Amino acid sequence: MNHLVIISVFLSSVLLLYRGESGITSSFIRSEWPAVDIPLDHHVFKVPKGYNAPQQVHITQGDYDGKAVIISWVTPDEPGSSQVHYGAVQGKYEFVAQGTYHNYTFYKYKSGFIHHCLVSDLEHDTKYYYKIESGESSREFWFVTPPHVHPDASYKFGIIGDMGQTFNSLSTLEHYMESGAQAVLFLGDLSYADRYQYNDVGVRWDSWGRFVERSTAYQPWLWSAGNHEVDYMPYMGEVTPFRNYLQRYTTPYLASKSSSPLWYAVRRASAHIIVLSSYSPFVKYTPQWHWLSEELTRVDREKTPWLIVLMHVPIYNSNEAHFMEGESMRAAFEEWFVQHKVDVIFAGHVHAYERSYRISNVRYNVSSGDRYPVPDKSAPVYITVGDGGNQEGLAGRFTEPQPDYSAFREASYGHSTLDIKNRTHAIYHWNRNDDGKKVATDEFVLHNQYWGKNIRRRKLKKHYIRSVVGGWIAT
């Protein structure tokens, strides 16, 4: 009986993705913390003990297929060592990787020494322990590599955007760390340090690095840049876009033949993840346009059935904040997204949560005389997760009436998870930060655009279908 109920819920979820059912505008109002940054003397920004001890440790994927990581950290007083000692047994570091370091200035702020170290030739699905040393100070962490790239490799991603460093941000981070997710897809707008001036800009980049280290040192965060990473401040003499961000946060862009760290792609487990830059040129014949055109042809849905795109500015958004800002990128890329049957597109920027049905504006519904998005079974689901908790507060004013394409929307802080079960199904949750409790507010079953088609489902043997669906039900 329980299995029948679960199957019924699953089928209802699938139908809702395709039918233009009336969406939900949540009336929930929570008592959030004030939208102000946490004071610098708070324990969440605590500097590690020991002279010149490594801090702001974070890792990201270091290659195309998940057999490498890039480990980054800062030593505040002097360079120290750029080596990472690592191994598969705690306390036994049989391997050593050599990194590099640099520092930079921003106005009169001078950064610490920023280290980046590529650790490669790792085994899949293995827990590694690593140690970073600086003189007599050392710190130890661990991470787990993803499974082999395989169509049925299960994997759970967290999705966070527009985070900042307020008490609401802390609530989001703490809730996320209880989710069991294995890596973060970050949708841009990290520290919000650009809301400060002069030397405080760099100081708040440092504090944010220490703030998120409790997660970023132990699992990869896949970065994308937002408008608050641009840091264009000509009144301070700083006119190089993304200067702070690019000095501190590196990406494996060369592995996907990108010419810029701001747009790139990786394969992880059963997912092919494409990261785009909303604040770099993307119109026809630009480097980003050419790269995306080529990268989409490299996607092999037989190996990585889940095609996920990250960007900062949402293409579809019914909030009054940043309304229609994503229209230029929609015009440039939406036809490709539909053609290649992208499963889901995540964005941030709008400080609220919203999920769409599968819709597109590739072919206008001209029968009504309006150019308006229409249901499209080949289109992605668009999800805005710009509710990480930053000091600008929530965007609480949605357009009325709710558009037909909008399935669910709410102005609350939170994070999402995408739990990929196999090549055909994934379970999605949006978790609201509800007064210190983890609450799953919006959830549905996402079926894969490639393997969900009948012609390809027939390629799967009947016993395989029973095993993967039965396994999903059992969980």
UniProtKB/Swiss-Prot annotation:
Predominantly, its location class is other
Give the pH-dependence text from the record: Optimum pH is 5.6 for the phosphatase activity and 8.8 for the peroxidase activity.
GO-annotated molecular function? acid phosphatase activity; lactoperoxidase activity; metal ion binding
User: Where, in this chain's numbering, is Zn(2+) bound?
Assistant: D189, N227, H312, H349
Residues forming the catalytic site: H322 (proton donor)
Q: Tell me how the cofactor is bound.
A: Binds 1 Fe cation per subunit.
The alphabetized UniProt keywords are: Glycoprotein, Hydrogen peroxide, Hydrolase, Iron, Metal-binding, Oxidoreductase, Peroxidase, Signal, Vacuole, Zinc
What is the E.C. number? Answer: 3.1.3.2, 1.11.1.7
Post-translational modification, as annotated:
Glycosylated.
Catalyses which reaction?
a phosphate monoester + H2O = an alcohol + phosphate; 2 a phenolic donor + H2O2 = 2 a phenolic radical donor + 2 H2O
Q: Indicate yes or no for the key word Hydrolase.
A: yes
Q: List the disulfide bonds.
A: none
Q: In which tissues is it expressed?
A: Expressed in roots, stems, leaves, flowers and siliques.
Q: Which GO terms describe its cellular component?
A: plant-type vacuole; plastid; secretory vesicle; vacuole
Source domain of life is: Eukaryota
Q: How is its activity regulated?
A: Activated by Mg(2+), Co(2+), Mn(2+) and Ba(2+). Inhibited by Fe(2+), Cu(2+), Zn(2+), NaF, molybdate, arsenate, vanadate and inorganic phosphate. No effect of tartrate, Asp, Gln, glutathione, Asn, ascorbic acid and phosphite.
Any signal peptide, and if so, which residues?
Answer: 1-30
Q: Per UniProt, where does Fe cation bind? A: D162, D189, Y192, H351
Report the locations given in the UniProt record: Vacuole
Which residues get glycosylated?
N103, N365, N422
For the biological process aspect of GO, one term held by this record is:
phosphate ion homeostasis
Q: What induces it?
A: Not induced at the transcription level by phosphate starvation, but accumulation of the protein in starved shoots.
- Summarize subunit and interaction data from the UniProt record for this chain: Homodimer.
Q: What protein family is recorded?
A: Belongs to the metallophosphoesterase superfamily. Purple acid phosphatase family.
So what does this one do? Metallo-phosphoesterase involved in phosphate metabolism. Acid phosphatase activity with phosphoenolpyruvate, inorganic pyrophosphate, phenyl-phosphate and p-nitrophenyl-phosphate as the most effective substrates. No activity with phytic acid, phosphocholine or bis-p-nitrophenyl-phosphate. Has a peroxidase activity at alkaline pH.
Spell out the protein name for this chain: Bifunctional purple acid phosphatase 26
Organism (species): Arabidopsis thaliana (Mouse-ear cress)
Gene expressing this chain: PAP26
